[in-house]
Structures are given as structure tokens and as C-alpha cells.
A protein has these predicted regions:
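Alpha-helical tetratricopeptide repeat
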Residues: 1-11
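Inward-facing hydrophobic residues that define packing positions of alpha-helical scaffold repeats
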Residues: 8, 27-28, 34, 44, ...
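Alpha-helical linker/edge segments of TPR/alpha-solenoid repeat scaffolds
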Residues: 39, 46-64
């Protein structure tokens, strides 16, 4: 299993157990493994979605 697939797998497992912050970190780590920012963009979008889940669930407090 390559590094990108490894981080994506860990992100999926974290999401399944409701740990959206860890899922976002793993998607970010997967994105950073791509040779260009454009190639990593889909993983960054998934990381943003995971962070949005965390905010919605009150796991991350957003200042005003």
C-alpha cells in the first residue's frame, strides 16, 4: 500500500469512528504526498468536509 492510500484508509477509519479531526489530518497528509498542489486538491476538499463535520458536532469551537 502506498503512502497516499495509507493515509486515505486511516482517514476513512477515523471518519467511521466519528473522529473527524483525525480524518481531516490524514486527508491533509495524503494531499501533501502528491507531487503538485493540483493533484492533492481532492484530498484537501475531503479534509475541509471532515473539519466541517467536526464543527457541526461541536468538536471544534469556532470563534466569532
Amino acid at each position: 500500500m502506498d503512502t497516499i492510500a495509507y493515509h486515505q484508509k486511516l482517514a476513512g477509519l477515523a471518519h467511521e469512528r466519528g473522529d473527524y479531526v483525525s480524518a481531516a489530518r490524514h486527508y491533509r497528509d495524503a494531499a501533501n504526498c502528491y507531487p503538485s498542489a493540483e493533484q492533492g486538491e481532492p484530498c484537501l476538499k475531503l479534509a475541509e468536509q471532515e473539519l466541517a463535520h467536526a464543527v457541526a458536532k461541536g468538536m471544534i469551537l469556532v470563534g466569532h
